């Protein structure tokens, strides 16, 4: 799960809670960035509210900044951000991103690139109910005719605005409901 660690927008927090609840309802384990703030904390709280298992992965430099999720069933503290991302990739069966900022984008792009290059075949899903990423998606789409981005790379990322559809896509069920 990639999501914001700073904003406190009510609609973002509500979305994160719904995603966490839905993950738990499916009996899945939530693997997230290990913070207890913003959407990151809300998704974990949502999962736990339905009896879900949560795994938080946080670099020691962020333990105090993002207030480590000490309620996680398993809290893994890494030395670096790179180690955090590797542990999250290793422990995840799919990648789901919610609205976020540069940290969310960095994690999303790394997983996206690795999948496009064949380093993993895990589903990669962007849950974007309010059009947070529309500008980014338009820009990326504009790069296809120039050759900077392959259409196949864009097709590797499934985009939806619905929580259940996002989880179905994570499970390999369904199709991308937004065309690039």
Tell what function each PLM region has:
Residues 32-81:
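Glycine-rich, small/polar surface segments that engage phosphate groups of diverse ligands
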Residues 90, 94, 145-180:
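A charged, well-structured terminal subsegment
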Residues 4, 35, 59, 100, ...:
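Cofactor-binding loop segments of dinucleotide-utilizing enzymes, especially the Rossmann-like FAD-
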Residues 1-53:
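Glycine-rich beta-alpha loop segments
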Residues 38-45, 132-141:
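Glycine-rich, charge-decorated loop segments at or immediately adjacent to ligand/cofactor-binding or catalytic sites
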Residues 58, 98, 105, 112-138, ...:
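Short, acidic/small-residue loops that bind anionic groups at enzyme active sites
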Residues 83-118, 125, 174-180:
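Active-site/ligand-binding-proximal alpha/beta "capping" segment
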């Amino acid at each position: 799960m990639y999501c914001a660690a700073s904003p406190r927008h009510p609609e973002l927090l509500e979305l994160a809670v719904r995603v966490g609840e839905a993950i738990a309802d499916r009996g899945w384990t939530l693997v997230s960035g290990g913070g207890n703030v913003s959407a990151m904390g809300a998704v974990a709280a949502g999962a736990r509210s339905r009896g879900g298992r949560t795994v938080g992965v946080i670099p020691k430099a962020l333990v105090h900044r993002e207030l480590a999720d000490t309620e996680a069933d398993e809290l893994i503290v890494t030395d670096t951000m790179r180690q955090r991302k590797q542990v999250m990739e290793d422990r995840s069966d799919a990648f789901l991103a919610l609205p976020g900022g540069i940290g969310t984008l960095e994690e999303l792009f790394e997983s996206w690139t690795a999948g496009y290059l064949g380093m993993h075949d895990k589903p990669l899903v962007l849950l974007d109910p309010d059009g947070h990423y529309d500008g980014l998606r338009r820009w990326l789409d504009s790069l296809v005719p120039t050759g900077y981005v392959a259409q196949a790379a864009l097709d590797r990322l499934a985009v939806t605005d619905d929580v259940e559809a996002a989880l179905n896509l994570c499970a390999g069920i369904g199709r991308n409901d937004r065309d690039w």
